[in-house]
Amino acid sequence: MHKDLKKRIYTSIILFLLLYAMAMNNYILGYFLIIIGIYSIIEFFNIISLIPKIKRVKYFLINFFFITYIFIFCTLFLILSSYLYLKIVIFIILLTCVASDVGGFVFGKFFKGPKLTKISPKKTISGAIGSIIFSLTLISTTTYYLTNKFDLGIFIIGLFVSIGCQLGDLFISFLKRKSSIKDTGKFLPGHGGILDRIDGMLIGVPI
């Protein structure tokens, strides 16, 4: 099995556990988010500390911003998921994040073509397009199945979620290149860290 495909499978497992926790109990979800949040912060600290010649004040401000962001992200996620309707919405958005990641990988490997950016040389324009196509297809199909109608608003949300996922991925890729590292951590031995798996969700879900 292709190494990158394995990473996508790990991403799906993490998302499945998160969705299962949401469906079962908010306390379980809370513990899950705490674990993910702590590991994300630790990995982020390590990445920033490896950036050459970074000033102490800048290092402190970047880390402070990330801690605040993760805290707000996890808190709002937990609060919103306590409402059934919003829980369904979050469920659809998380599935869209998965579709964005898988779509980008499949299209990028199959069609290849021009690179998207120097920040992440493995990313291609075809992959970015595939990411959007997969996301819009999934979110539109799921919404139609649940409501028996096409919702333009949800369609637009899916577009922004897909773009957000790709921006999150590029952001973490940018930091890894600056730090000269391949993976954000070793939480999943041989397959990277937590940030490697949830980078897209950090921007995609809040949108």
Each predicted region: which residue ranges?
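Membrane-embedded alpha-helical bundles of polytopic integral membrane proteins
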Residues: 1-159, 163
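Juxtamembrane helix-boundary/capping and inter-helix hinge elements in multi-pass membrane proteins
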Residues: 112-117, 177-186
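Membrane-interface alpha-helices at helix entry/exit sites of multi-pass transporters
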Residues: 118-129, 184-198
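Final/C-terminal transmembrane alpha-helix of multipass membrane proteins
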Residues: 197-207
